[in-house]
Amino acid sequence: MKRFWLFILPLLALPASSCISVGLDAVSGSTLIWNSGSNNYFNREAYTTLSGPKKLWIDGEVEQPTEVKLSKFPLRTVTVKEATYCKEGDSIAFLGAYRYEGYALCDILSGLKVDKASKEDLWPPIDLYIEIRNQAGDKAVFSWGEIFYSANMYGIVIAKRVTRVIPGKTGELWDLPTEMKLISTTDQISVRNIPSPTHISVHSLRGNYVVNRAPEVLENDPGRLAVQTSFKDTAAVLTELPKDLPVVTYPVLFYGNSTGYKGIREFSGQMLSRVIAPWFPSNDYHTVQTGMLSIAGVDGFRAAFSVSEIVNRNDHKEILLRQDGVSFSIYTACDAFADRSIKGLSEIRLIQTEP
């Protein structure tokens, strides 16, 4: 028996020798460094810790403004390819590919007690959005839906540490950031990745919404969808889908946050990003970074959508604009839940966020 254990113990140790450990993370394994023989291409160097704020101030439509300590939340791992707009050359510059570990907005805001202004006429929180700022005055906006309804629930983080995703053949070492930063993993161009965020404000959509959920309101939908660049400025009124855009079809397991499984459905429509491109182009980077849209139905039901989550996606989970008869609706392929798939659309409006 003694001889058996002398033989088997060295074999048990073999798997551990294929990678180098730097403070093992038993949950994600994200602190492992890649070594020859490992199949994980995201861990080819040790992480670098980023300096930055240790706390966040949260206010707005909340029961009590509060300061939260970031270190109380778990670190979530995300990978992202970052690119930014260069004003000088009117071009896109690739910054690099990185693995970040940071504090997810989903975790930070999960325990927050919201007191939204619209609670009397719209119970779901889908009309909420947040503004994130730093001490330099930079701002980025996110809808409540892309934080809490998204199928990628930990995809927006305040990064605390970083490693490069190093190309195996070229060995290119991208420049590392030096300070903590906001990371949105589904953004094609990284305009919302502002450095060292310190402040979050919670808001709800404002507008002349008339809430009437009676079935006949949707049945008598006139089929007129206003595209508005402000509360007073209507850029277009759609009565049909564009003729020159392709139709996309998604077969889905439809699931509501409140009512659960709704069956297997198939949704066909046009990419909303392309339909609204004449008024909200993806290369209007200031609006992509700070713009929030109200998408509302004739019955007053509405949801907030950041401009970025519609026109600046990199995950190909497009929001579809559909038309059934004369009535417009959207399907949100990016969401785990059906709640923001609004029917009987009457407006897509750019709202005025805080300066």
Question: Where on the chain are the PLM-derived regions?
Answer:
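Positively charged n-region of N-terminal signal peptides that target proteins for export
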Residues: 1-4
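Bacterial N-terminal signal peptides
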Residues: 8-15
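N-terminal intrinsically disordered, low-complexity segments enriched in P/E/S/T
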Residues: 20-355
